[in-house]
Amino acid sequence: MTNIRERISNKRNVLIAGALIALMAIGSTFAYFVDRDSVTNSFTVGDVEISVSEPNWDPDEGLDITPNKVMKKDPKITNEGANDAFVFMRVTVPRATVKTANDDGTLNAKANQDLFTFTSNSGWKLIKSSNGTLSSEYVYAYAADKMTVLAPGQTTATLFDTVKFINIIEEQLDGQDLDIVVDTMGIQTDDLGTDSPLEIYNIIMNQQDVPQ
């Protein structure tokens, strides 16, 4: 049957951090007394660094999978940097035009559809999705209505815990390798001017080093 090759882009991280170094000169002049003083304010630039892990994923589970097979797959993000972060996951699921069966054995018409399904966990919000011929893309923010701050050293809840291969009729995809790709993104929480998940995701996407 089908093999899954796991390609997890576990460090596609976005660093948007800055510091303004302010120089302040304070002078006071009097008729007979002159006093001058100056102060230089020093700032240290922090960083945003995240990592992704799937502690329960077993690559052997992805070998020779069968219809309706459920596999453990539990991506989560850890803030490895020095600054609070807002984080996102983008999941790309392979699609194909295939025929499937219902639980009672009846057949469905051939259709272009996702080859794997999953159920997202509490704490994550779907903010964007798209379907193409070869893949679907789902973008989740670590958020409720507003973004949730991920402090340094903290780890998110898992986005999902399992993936399920659809009930495909055999011999349609034999010998093919199927990839579920999970990209993770993080950005500083300060000075963004918004806490809207979609607006912040768009800020990340506007950075030149992030693939869209």
Predicted segments, located by residue:
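Surface-exposed, hydrophilic segments of mature proteins
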Residues: 2-6, 14-16, 23-25, 32-212
